[in-house]
Amino acid sequence: MAKQKFERTKPHVNIGTIGHIDHGKTTLTAAITKVLHDAHPDLNPFTPFDQIDKAPEEKARGITISIAHVEYQTDKRHYAHVDCPGHADYIKNMITGAAQMDGAILVVSATDGPMPQTKEHVLLARQVGVPYIVVALNKADMVDDEEILELVELEVRELLSSYEFPGDDVPVIRVSALKALEGDKEWGAKLLELMAAVDDSIPEPQRDIDRPFLMPIEDVFTITGRGTVVTGRVERGIVKVNETVEIVGIKPETTTTTVTGVEMFRKLLDEGRAGDNVGLLLRGIKREDVERGQVIVKPKTITPHTVFEARVYILNKDEGGRHTPFFKNYRPQFYFRTTDVTGVVTLPEGTEMVMPGDNTEMTVELIQPIAMEEGLRFAIREGGRTVGAGQVTKVLK
């Protein structure tokens, strides 16, 4: 059988299932692939439950995570869908951003209603910037009483509102993943309804190329007779020859310069785009004026900061993390983009210590400024060894 070519004609959106253990996240993922396979067999292979449940391990920012990737298409879109087998895997995935989500399907069992992990996942979604949620009220075939279904729906809406999601407007679709997976036509139709809601309520993400230019500096060279070249991978946006850029971070002051050349694989280009590994020739900049860890950006789009709040996951001993807890005034290195900066940790009110395997909020003060914005991810390291991962939730100073 010939391999299907990936069609770039449809918009691509990344989504995932979140919610409490045993509420049916993986069953729902399998059922979506089945129902879409039945509706559009030429577009969609069916991915069985056990294939998703045996999720392969991946590494993101030094942390091992089990994560299953499934793809499927609706009439309108191409989706990449992530599902994690274990609760800890969800937390690690959401904090490290191993698999970015443009939106999530929150799975809540109609027989249980929202449970502790439901709340934890919604809180994490809020903190790590999963912008949109659609609710699948699963196991609805097990509840005969309409009033109970309405109560559970109300509870879920209130929970979402309490974490600043638009609880009143979020689509809540009653489904039975198991029945749909077993081939029940009516419940299959409910899953198509769920996917129509996902199509309509999770907007297309802004592509990296449309965002303002940013490139983390990995290396600095001098080219005799031409000047200083910085190299790195363009994270977002486009940089053109003769454009003005700023060099931000590490040093107290921001420097402005002009890009006089863009090179890739020793060829001169007119521009560098998101995803390209390029060298940028900078006008009037000395080798010692720039260093790894700074970023080159479109002027006035990002600022340097030293104090921030973050949500972090601390590796346990088996994951190669610490063997002992840490306390306030812990001073590890924070690895942002391409470099380590030492920082001092303040723990939230009432938290005495953080154990390996915990996830927590914290405030950090860095000894050098970093070009920073909410949503920026980092690793926590001790002597080059990753002991945690996190994401900036609020810039303070």
UniProtKB/Swiss-Prot annotation:
Which residue intervals make up region (G4)? 138-141
Q: Where do the segments described as G1 lie?
A: 19-26
CDD domains (alphabetical)? EF_Tu, EFTU_II, EFTU_III
- UniProt region (G3), positions on chain: 83-86
Listed InterPro entries = EF-Tu_GTP-bd, EF-Tu_GTPase, EFTu-like_2, EFTU_2, G_TR_CS, P-loop_NTPase, Small_GTP-bd, T_Tr_GTP-bd_dom
Q: Which GO terms describe its cellular component?
A: cytosol
Q: Give the matching NCBIfam families.
A: EF-Tu, PRK00049.1, PRK12735.1, PRK12736.1, small_GTP
- State what this protein does: GTP hydrolase that promotes the GTP-dependent binding of aminoacyl-tRNA to the A-site of ribosomes during protein biosynthesis.
UniProt protein name: Elongation factor Tu
Identify the species of origin: Frankia alni (strain DSM 45986 / CECT 9034 / ACN14a)
